[in-house]
Amino acid sequence: MSVLTPLLLRGLAGSARRLPVPRAQIHSKPPREQLGTMDVAIGITSCFLCFLLPAGWVLSHLESYKKRE
């Protein structure tokens, strides 16, 4: 690395610090209807079945994937 590299990096970082950072104005309304216990249970169960179950099956059968037959 050159001797000038730290000076260049410091110069770039200094000018980047002065730039304004745009902030998102996110506002949310209250929900139209509250979720019930059954709705939450169905949502969590479907997430488990769709994402975690296939991943668990693949991980449990990883040794059979490694073997070449």
Curated annotation (Swiss-Prot):
A biological-process GO annotation: mitochondrial electron transport, cytochrome c to oxygen
Mitochondrial intermembrane-side positions: 61-69
Primary site of residence: mitochondrion
Keyword Transmembrane helix in annotation: yes
Listed InterPro entries: Cyt_c_oxidase_su8, Cyt_c_oxidase_su8_sf
Pathway: Energy metabolism; oxidative phosphorylation
Motif (SIFI-degron): 2-19
Source species, domain of life: Eukaryota
Span of the transit peptide along the chain: 1-25
Positions on the Mitochondrial matrix side per record topology: 26-36
Post-translational modification, as annotated: In response to mitochondrial stress, the precursor protein is ubiquitinated by the SIFI complex in the cytoplasm before mitochondrial import, leading to its degradation. Within the SIFI complex, UBR4 initiates ubiquitin chain that are further elongated or branched by KCMF1.
Transmembrane segments: 37-60
Quaternary state and interactors: Component of the cytochrome c oxidase (complex IV, CIV), a multisubunit enzyme composed of 14 subunits. The complex is composed of a catalytic core of 3 subunits MT-CO1, MT-CO2 and MT-CO3, encoded in the mitochondrial DNA, and 11 supernumerary subunits COX4I, COX5A, COX5B, COX6A, COX6B, COX6C, COX7A, COX7B, COX7C, COX8 and NDUFA4, which are encoded in the nuclear genome.
Family under the similarity heading: Belongs to the cytochrome c oxidase VIII family.
Record's protein name: Cytochrome c oxidase subunit 8A, mitochondrial
Organism of this sequence: Carlito syrichta (Philippine tarsier)
Lineage: Eukaryota, Metazoa, Chordata, Craniata, Vertebrata
Gene: COX8A
